[in-house]
Amino acid sequence: MKPWLRKLNQWTKTIWPALIWSAFVFVLLIIPSSKLPNETLVPIPYFDKIVHLILFGGFAFFWDQYLSLQKGFFLKAYRYGFVILLIIVYGLLIEYLQVSVGRKFELMDLLADITGGIFMLKKIPGKIGRDRS
């Protein structure tokens, strides 16, 4: 394996990918409404909910990836439930903070966050595309 690839592989096993993705999600979802375009850029119904599904699917993937590699992590056996709890808490926090920047708390956004996370946890672990059941 090439040295740069080995370093990248080691880096992906750290907490940094999960933290960077979490920060990315936060920045995208906390943008003040005055900075958002009035017209949707993509004429797809519920496009904002699709964005939430994708962002929190990534959130679930990166946090599950990190937690699955932790030796001795006391919640390792329950990491899927723990990741879902993280999604709920983080989604609630973001929705609550959006009010302070002129946006609205939307329950449907929170449901899209949770759905995206659960879908990713169901589909990704092990081999891509293979159900856990």
Q: Where are the language model's segments positioned?
A:
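Membrane-interfacial, low-structure loops and terminal tails that flank and connect transmembrane helices
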Residues: 1-9, 73-76, 131-133
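Interfacial helix-loop-helix junctions of multi-pass membrane proteins
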Residues: 37-39, 45, 91-115
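"…centered on the first transmembrane helix and the immediately adjacent amphipathic helix/loop
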Residues: 1-66, 83
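Membrane-helix interface segments
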Residues: 13, 75-81, 106-107
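Membrane-interfacial alpha-helical segments at the cytosolic side of multi-pass membrane proteins
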Residues: 54-70, 117-128
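Short helix-coil transition/hinge motifs at the ends and kinks of transmembrane helices
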Residues: 35-39, 69-78
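Small-polar-interrupted transmembrane alpha-helices in polytopic inner-membrane proteins
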Residues: 20-29, 79-99, 114
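Short helix-capping/hinge motifs at transmembrane helix termini and TM-loop junctions
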Residues: 31-32, 102, 128
